[in-house]
Amino acid sequence: MLRAGPMTLKFADGELRYLHAGGREIVRRIYFAVRDHRWDTAMPRFSVLRVEKGGDSFGIELAADCRTATADYSWRGRITGTAEGVLTFEADGVANRDFGSNRIGLCVLFGSDSLAGQTFATAGESGERAGEFPRLVAPALVAEKFRELRYTTASGVTVCAGMGGAVFDMEDQRNYGDSSFKAYAPLPYAYPAVAAGSSASQILRLAVEGAARAPLGAAETRVRIGGIIAGARIPKLAETAPGTREVDFFAVNTHRAAHAAVRRLQFAFNPALHLPDDDTFMENPSALPDMVRTARIIAPGAAIRIDPITFDSQHPRPARDPRNASQFGAVWSALVVKYLALAGVGEAAFAIDGGPARAVLRELAAFAGCAVRETVVAAEGRAPVEALAIDDGPGVRLWLMNTTDLPQRVLLADGDVFTPLELAPHEIWRGNRAR
């Protein structure tokens, strides 16, 4: 964990993740992206990676080479965080060969589950404009051509993000199953040719106001069960039938008139389009309730079915993800079922063939139609454990899911008494509680 005054954050794989201030997430992620003309992501290989950590500040230097079959790009970065709550990310890059690219540069993700409904203001080439992080999934850009973005979180912390070296647009990534809004620098035209030796520089400056320096919290996660959530039930679960046509939500959201009168609306959930890391995959199921709420606006009264559900890569080429066969796949599947239940989805089908995941889905399928209770999960930063409480007859079935590859300590509340639990990496803990 790194700190910049009142701001705390995680640094992993050359990225800044889960920036928190004032007890809430203010930015989901900041990273440098290189994608070729087929949207294939050139994953960075770091030759320099130095982190200097102070009590209230930090400094990072990094250098990366990004290559695909056609792309070859190198960049150097300098990241600093000060005790005054100011973060700066500078990046200088150069193309090592001619290649076609869809994206090169800094990207900033803003969590939809923490910022949806909050207002913002942008400043740029078209002057100042007011907007809102949308609650429903936006089919068009959320903001365009800006160099500065300013917003206030629900806890009263003001965040100002200034971008240099390019103008930025912001899209709603929930269209693709990601639980975020993404600010990025669009390239000037489709599939531009990047010439060997061409260089570019970008800088992001992020400052927070109105956030006190909070002490680092305890290492454990606290979980408490609440009351039944109206309309939340475990859906009927099945396996995706061979040959099922995959319709992505973006196609539904951008062609609303074609779906307005349907009696049954089916779309896929596959969050593998953008970032493939473990953190991203565990974040993205929380986008499902917003996607379903939007679908119900598009097709009022229609039965909603999510099918297929998978995290196998489909673009730029289909590929089976090896995490299907691991305990990671089991936790991810249980997490998806939780958010399907919160969304009130009636039916869902999975295209995941790993043994642990299939066992979990068979177990959860037995609870189809059961009500779901509220669970309150409290942790320092982003909670590493998720909870699912199923109202089943005389009692409550509680599932605790460790979404990380590290052991986690949990304190489970029963009134004023807390029971300590230790969860192994990607463990699903099951227990019963009286109503």
Set out the residue ranges of the language-model regions.
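Acidic-aromatic substrate-binding/catalytic surfaces of carbohydrate-active enzymes
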Residues: M1-D65, T119, S126
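Beta-strand-rich recognition/accessory modules
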Residues: R3, Y31, D65-A69, R150-I228
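Polysaccharide-binding surfaces and accessory modules of carbohydrate-active proteins
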Residues: T80-V167, H426
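Catalytic domains of carbohydrate-active enzymes, especially glycoside hydrolases
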Residues: A219, I228-T240
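Noncatalytic carbohydrate-binding groove/subsite architecture in carbohydrate-active enzymes
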Residues: A241-S326
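Aromatic/acidic polysaccharide-binding cleft in carbohydrate-active enzymes
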Residues: R305-A365, V377-A379
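Carbohydrate-binding surface patches
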Residues: A379-G415
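C-terminal beta-strand-rich structural cap/linker in extracellular carbohydrate-active enzymes
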Residues: L421-R435
